[in-house]
Amino acid sequence: MNLIFLGPPGAGKGTYAKRVVEKYIIPHISTGDIFREAIAKGTELGRKVQDIVNSGNLVPDELTNALVEERLKQDDCKKGFILDGYPRTLNQAQALNEMLKKMGKELDGAIYFEVDEETVVQRISTRRVCSKCGKVYNVITLPSKVEGICDDCGGTLIQRDDDKEDIVRSRYRVYIEKTSPLIEYYKNQNKLFTLDGRKSVEEVMKILFNILGGFEKK
């Protein structure tokens, strides 16, 4: 089962991916993880990524595509995978099609967790993180027992700069602008499945598992 997860920050992709991984025993792959792994291993591609990251530039499509292809050839991807954060561009989407074709595979579906701007702002701007242990809270949906204090270690809960409202709005708008062509691309290929990411995790998972059940019957 070969999947792409699409959705703005705060859509819950990580939560849904975790549940799918547990059920289907397939890896959840993000480009960030791929970059970190390549750098840690000190491979030739990893060294190139390290140089680019150190210089403050974005990793070009060609290098990202090569690293993704290398990752998808690993044994744990034989039964399938979830790609998160890739593809980000039409160029990358076309490259993914080509690399899967070479491997004798195809994409089963691009799952788009659609969430409006106000919901994303509410979810992320109410997030708090322990400055000591990194545990994540939410002042509305997952508050600590004592306001501003971590339940586990007693550390101070802080709001990360990335979680502040103006930054969240900017990130959301950039994501929608960049992702719109991808949504159309996968819609035209009849690969797009749009889920209402405003619903509860359980409601979304029920619909998602129904979709994935259809892929299993192929």
From Swiss-Prot:
It is found in: Cytoplasm. Its EC number is 2.7.4.3. GO terms for cellular component: cytoplasm. Catalyzes the reversible transfer of the terminal phosphate group between ATP and AMP. Plays an important role in cellular energy homeostasis and in adenine nucleotide metabolism. AMP binds at residues 31, 36, 57-59, 85-88, 92, 160, 171. SUPFAM superfamilies: P-loop containing nucleoside triphosphate hydrolases. Belongs to the adenylate kinase family. It comes from Fervidobacterium nodosum (strain ATCC 35602 / DSM 5306 / Rt17-B1). It comes from the Bacteria. ATP binds at residues 10-15, 127, 136-137, 199. Zn(2+) binds at residues 130, 133, 150, 153. Coiled coil: none annotated. The keyword Manganese does not apply. Pathway: Purine metabolism; AMP biosynthesis via salvage pathway; AMP from ADP: step 1/1. Transmembrane segments: none annotated. Pfam families: ADK, ADK_lid. Residues 30-59 are annotated as: NMP. This is Adenylate kinase. Consists of three domains, a large central CORE domain and two small peripheral domains, NMPbind and LID, which undergo movements during catalysis. The LID domain closes over the site of phosphoryl transfer upon ATP binding. Assembling and dissambling the active center during each catalytic cycle provides an effective means to prevent ATP hydrolysis. Some bacteria have evolved a zinc-coordinating structure that stabilizes the LID domain.
